[in-house]
Amino acid sequence: PSSGWLFNSIANKHADAMDNYPEPMVLPRAADDQATAQALSSVLPVVLEQADYEQVYSDVWWRKLKQGTGVTGIFWDPAARGGLGDIAVRSVNLLMLYWEPGVQDIQDSPDLFHLSLEDTARLTAQYPQLAGHAAGVVDVPRYIHEDGQTTANKSVVVDWYYKRPDENGKLRLHYCKLCNGVVLYASQNDPALAARGLYDHGKYPFVFDPLFVEEDSPAGFGYIDVMKDCQNAIDKMNHAMDENVLLASRQRYV
């Protein structure tokens, strides 16, 4: 049987990360920023609690320890709070992100693609222009499940984030949502966002947190990459000891 050495190592490291769950503390840059810093220090914990950030933090750390990179997505959800809108923070699957090869910082990539599987009927009801385009044209990596999950009634939605300079040369972040070759939304076609871009800060809404850094990549490698050979060696030694115990325990007849 396999030992739980690798699993226990990762579980203990995750427990250490949860014991050190961070809390926001905003310090003033100047004396006249004191009131603003105090206000932000009071507001940010509430925002994170409403976004269920502790669960997101836990999920990101599991992926960071196992896969080598934890990715947090920070978005604006206009449908939250009864249509008032609010910040949404989510743990993002690294396998569903695609960027320009060779960049060290994800913000240096001119384009960034985020893929997701969504129900085709629900998408068609929300975006009528998708009617008649139910055939999937993009495939995505999938985890292997014991219950044999089917994706026959789902379509791949591509969230395309890209940076382009405006007439003044300043990089603006834009966003295009596509599904089965149909444009569902484009910020450059939105009069409110065509000139200013999707977000005023002009950055991709994804934060990469690698465990062990790789050169020329925003992603890293994790403990499974480092410790799997040791786990295999432990299992082989355990198997050899079990065989010896079984052989030694057999009753001998003279």
Over which residues does each language-model region extend?
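Extended alpha-helical, oligomerization-prone segments that build pores/tubes and scaffolds
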Residues: P1-V254
